[in-house]
Amino acid sequence: MDNARRKTPARLDAACFWQIWQRFDKEEKGYIRETELDAFFDHLLAKSGTEDTLMEENVQKVKEQLMTSHNVSKEGRILMKELASMFLSEDENFLLFFRLETPLDNSVEFMQIWRKYDADSSGFISAAELCNFLRDLFLHHKKNISEAELEEYTSTMMKIFDKNKDGRLDLNDLARILALQENFLLQFKMDASSTEERKRDFEKIFAHYDVSKTGALEGPEVDGFVKDMMELVQPSISGVDLDKFREILLRHCDVNKDGKIQKSELALCLGLKINP
């Protein structure tokens, strides 16, 4: 395995690998089928832009080692992580997989990150702001990299996650980078519930977003709630839209105008009467 890794084309980076991978894993499940492996390697060789026989032999060796090792599941699935580790450097692997190791399960935490790095409150993350995010990320994981490498990795991340190629990332792009888990509110069916069930669900919902446990939603807690609420009816919202919806919610629910949404205020907005 080590020899095969050393001989595979070093020019392949995370962005290039991701571009090829997406052809086969369009739903981003994180694996491809064993039956798709030949086509995957054909695209890999074509993307490398060379007809080097030695390289083709090495790719074939990687495939053989992959099939003879325990990297193929009983269902015939091959994980992206297994293939990427054979072709990408340690740092390039890190760019693809750091988010899989520490996925976010709470929109409040996600919005804290969004607000921190959208420093100019434009509703987008620029390349410079993404660079700051990656710098902090590498430091958090105790990885030392040069400024030149940081610029290169920022460029790579933009290639991978800037879906509409406008040179900036929106809310949905960052959610993909951070592997934000499924919308918490999807599990609740408020309209189809009895009054008691709605009250019980409300308690769960409020507790989920009241991360600080103060009895009021404020700052990123409001942001997280608004994001999840709006995405129930509009699957893809921008940072600008989120700010608009946030203002509307505060205008309607923040009765005492303290910039927070008290538990009783949110209940009133949702047409519920709760015990003090």
UniProtKB/Swiss-Prot annotation:
Which positions bind Ca(2+) 1? D25, Y31, E36
Q: Which InterPro entries match?
A: Calbindin_Ca-bind, EF-hand-dom_pair, EF_Hand_1_Ca_BS, EF_hand_dom, EFh_SCGN
Superkingdom is: Eukaryota
What is an example of a Pfam family matching this protein? EF-hand_7
Q: Which Gene3D superfamilies match?
A: EF-hand
Q: How does it sit in the membrane?
A: Peripheral membrane protein
- Which residues does the annotation say bind Ca(2+) 2? S73, E75, R77, E82
Q: Where does Ca(2+) 4 bind?
A: D162, N164, D166, R168, D173
Which GO-annotated molecular functions does the record name?
Answer: calcium ion binding
Q: Entry's SUPFAM superfamilies?
A: EF-hand
Q: Which UniProt keywords apply?
A: Calcium, Cytoplasm, Cytoplasmic vesicle, Membrane, Metal-binding, Repeat, Secreted
Q: Where in the cell is it found?
A: Cytoplasm; Secreted; Cytoplasmic vesicle, Secretory vesicle membrane
The positions annotated for binding Ca(2+) 3 are D118, D120, S122, E129
Q: Which GO terms describe its cellular component?
A: extracellular region; transport vesicle membrane
- List, for all copies, the residue spans of the domain called EF-hand: 12-47, 58-93, 105-140, 149-184, 197-232, 240-276
Q: Name the PANTHER family for this protein.
A: CALBINDIN, SECRETAGOGIN
Question: What name does the UniProt record give this protein?
Answer: Secretagogin
Query: Which species is this record about?
Result: Mus musculus (Mouse)
